[in-house]
């Protein structure tokens, strides 16, 4: 059975309103939340074969906090996932190799929520 884990990036910071959206980091609360989610995944989630992650800083920082939970999964950081709609995310998932049983997708709302 194929499995998909949909993850929105953890809480981002709005401390510097001059930063481009793509470069917004996680807030301290977001770092803590991502670490808690990693603990949860280690205990409860199936082994992940592939992680697809948006190239935005906050999604990459979320991934960094969760990397251990994904074990030896292949990791792909992709520009096309930043700002992707649900249809675009679905199209990207259709291109995943058949050998991947469990895929984690770290992205943004509204795309993740709508998917």
Regions found by a protein language model. Give the residues of each.
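A generic local structural motif
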Residues: 38-40, 90-93
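Short beta->alpha junction loops/turns
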Residues: 56, 82, 108-109
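Active-site-proximal alpha-helix that buttresses catalytic centers in soluble enzyme cores
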Residues: 3, 7-79
């Amino acid at each position: 059975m194929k499995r998909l884990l949909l993850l929105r990036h953890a809480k981002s910071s709005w401390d510097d309103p001059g930063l481009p959206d793509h470069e917004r980091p996680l807030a301290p609360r977001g770092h803590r939340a991502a670490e808690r989610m990693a603990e949860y995944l280690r205990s409860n989630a199936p082994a992940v074969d592939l992680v697809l992650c948006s190239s935005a800083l906050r999604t990459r920082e979320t991934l960094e906090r969760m990397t251990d939970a994904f074990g030896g999964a292949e990791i792909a950081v992709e520009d096309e996932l930043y700002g992707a709609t649900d249809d675009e995310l679905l199209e990207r998932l259709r291109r995943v190799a058949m050998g991947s049983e469990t895929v984690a997708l770290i992205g943004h709302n509204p795309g993740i929520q709508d998917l």
